[in-house]
């Protein structure tokens, strides 16, 4: 993945949070970074050292044009970081189906669109890497965040299937699985989607636990460092579980009976 200009990488959702920290770190390590944003002008003001591309991962034409522009400017693509996403809060019963579809349109189908457009260039590279940013919630679903958790579980399956599909090629795939991370992503989560919920205090307690956990969580730089390792290590891991809490939960999921694991989740979130 070496060249005079350094390897080229496309990072989706690069204007804030994990994406911004990743784009900054990769640029500092010599990567030619193409960052996507729905508002590239504002993103350029924050980080002029990144080559910004307008892209809405929900739109086929926008994704196609964004990937094309990156290839036109660099001539190749050595790595892809699929990071664009957001969260919603509310019960399975009360979140409108249209809102649930929108969650998957960004988190799941958005990732799929970018992968499909970038794959031919990645397969043509001498050695290429893909990092898909999932979440611990994909393996330990959060009460009243079922839609977000399910979208991340879908990315978990996507990353593992893609790893096997590309195993005979020169492309390596890693799933990045962070726990709670303190970013602007959390501010963008719609906690007031469902007002006057039938679940009352239980939903309120779950929200309070989430907000307290996020307030004391590590910053996005810890995830950016894991992504850097996935893109530069000779034999990258299939899964990078990021953060002490995430590693503990991953261990518990592996060894505890499922019923006990669900009970611990209920106790933690006060539901």
Regions of interest found by a model, annotated:
Residues 165-214:
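C-terminal beta-strand-loop-alpha-helix "lid" module of Rossmann-like NAD(P)-dependent dehydrogenases
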Residues 15-16:
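Conserved glycine-rich cofactor-binding loop
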Residues 115, 151-154:
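Active-site helix of classical SDR
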Residues 47-61:
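Rossmann-fold cofactor-recognition segment
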Residues 135:
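Residue(s) in the substrate-gating loop at a strand-loop-helix junction
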Residues 91-92, 96-101:
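Substrate-binding pocket helix/loop in short-chain dehydrogenase/reductase
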Residues 93, 140-146:
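Active-site loop immediately N-terminal to the catalytic Tyr-X3-Lys motif
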